[in-house]
From Swiss-Prot:
Designated name of the protein: A-type ATP synthase subunit D
Record organism: Methanosarcina mazei (strain ATCC BAA-159 / DSM 3647 / Goe1 / Go1 / JCM 11833 / OCM 88) (Methanosarcina frisia)
GO BP: proton motive force-driven plasma membrane ATP synthesis
Function: Component of the A-type ATP synthase that produces ATP from ADP in the presence of a proton gradient across the membrane.
Family: Belongs to the V-ATPase D subunit family.
Length: 209
């Protein structure tokens, strides 16, 4: 707010005081929101790290199982078995709110399957195929969980940065400028009052003369 654009009046001084009070209140609320978002972010970050560790282990296990199944049954047989599934997994996307930020909720159906649902039956296959299917179903579930957590972290981080910018703008620009303008108006009002007092004294002096 440029000081030269402000009229040095008492009503303007009152308006400025209200703006400062409102800005300070908004600044306090935004700081609380920022701190709350940071706490939520680190809570989810810890969970995401655990899931990422589980995901890496699940990937290593599924790779080991498919290599073993391929060595015993042949890669062609393993691939053929994979295409016999009667139904594909379904992913459902929804959202939920964390301190004003809408983050994804990813749920799935049909990832875990029974032998019947897998479609390849028992005859002509062995436990290596079953263990490979189990391992990859577990891997898919871990991928879904990791995707939800990592997307949530990204959205929270974006909101944290946005809130930090607003906090800093209020703290280092808006509020200081309002306070400086208020001081300027007070100074101008005091000067005007001194001038008026001086004029009044001169008028009284002339009247006495």
């Amino acid at each position: 707010m440029a000081q030269q654009d402000v009229k040095p009046t008492r009503s303007e001084l009152i308006n400025l005081k209200k703006k400062i009070k409102l800005s300070e209140s908004g600044h306090k609320l935004l700081k609380m929101k920022r701190d709350g978002l940071i706490l939520e972010f680190f809570k989810i970050l810890n969970e995401a790290r655990n899931v990422r560790t589980e995901l890496d282990a699940a990937f290593a296990k599924s790779t080991e199982k498919i290599n073993l199944a391929s060595a015993v049954n042949g890669m062609v047989a393993v691939r053929s078995t994979a295409f016999t599934a009667k139904e594909s997994p379904e992913i459902q996307l929804s959202g939920h709110n964390i301190m004003g930020v809408v983050v994804p909720k990813i749920s799935s159906t049909g990832v875990r399957k029974s032998l019947y649902e897998r479609g390849y039956g028992i005859i002509g296959t062995n436990s290596y195929i079953d263990e490979t299917a189990d391992a990859y179903e577990d891997l898919v579930e871990k991928i879904i969980t990791a995707a939800e957590l990592e997307t949530t972290m990204k959205r929270l981080l974006d909101e944290i940065e946005k809130t930090k910018r607003r906090v800093n703008a209020l703290e280092f620009k808006v509020i200081p400028e309002l306070i400086d303008t208020m001081k300027y108006i007070r100074f101008m009002l005091e000067e005007m009052e001194r001038e008026n007092t001086f004029r009044l004294k001169r008028v009284k002096a002339r009247m006495r003369d």
